[in-house]
């Protein structure tokens, strides 16, 4: 039977039965699901019923925020999300990182896509002034129907891993207004 089937279907293979891997890493996703890596989209995981990718379309919303307690998996998820956004298929990404003294995010300090990395609060105001200026410029381009100019703009990602930076931001009405206006 096997010999007849092999002769009948020469050069063909059965489709691989999909499975949920023990750990869903970015390298596994790149190898197994390359067709799902698109600009503005990040694969969040696999649907357990269909073993099909579950996608996050960052372009569909304005600001996307993740918060949580330390040691609860937030950092792992955010680092995965960040690495996925740094893939060429996602589009250009620009990082602004406000780290704390533990320097958990120091791997990105000299990354070519990092605009600002600081583990003090010295650059909090500068970062939000710069990002606000860029966002307002994008709104103006959009209002003037210059959508093509917007396509070349990078994604702006701000990572805040500093309770001191959060306290400074929370106490500054100008920065709060900037965030609300994004």
Question: Which ranges hold each PLM region?
Answer:
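P-loop NTPase catalytic phosphate-binding loop
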Residues: 21, 29-182
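P-loop NTPase motor module signature
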Residues: 11-14, 27-28, 60
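Conserved P-loop NTPase
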Residues: 1-15
């Amino acid at each position: 039977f096997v010999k007849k089937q092999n002769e009948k279907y020469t050069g063909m293979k059965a489709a691989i039965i999909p499975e949920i891997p023990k750990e869903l890493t970015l390298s596994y996703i790149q190898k197994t699901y390359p067709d799902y890596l698109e600009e503005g989209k990040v694969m969040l995981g696999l649907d357990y019923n269909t073993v099909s990718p579950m996608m996050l379309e960052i372009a569909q919303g304005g600001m996307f925020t993740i918060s949580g307690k330390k040691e609860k998996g937030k950092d792992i998820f955010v680092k995965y999300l960040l690495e996925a956004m740094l893939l060429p298929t996602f589009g250009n990404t620009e990082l602004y990182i406000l780290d704390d003294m533990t320097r958990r995010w120091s791997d990105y300090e000299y990354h070519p896509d990092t605009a600002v990395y600081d583990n003090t609060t010295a650059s909090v105001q500068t970062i939000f002034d710069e990002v606000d200026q860029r966002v307002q410029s994008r709104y103006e381009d959009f209002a003037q129907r210059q959508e093509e100019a917007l396509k070349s703009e990078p994604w702006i990602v701000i990572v805040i891993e500093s309770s001191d930076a959060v306290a400074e931001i929370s106490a500054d009405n100008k920065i709060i207004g900037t965030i609300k206006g994004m």
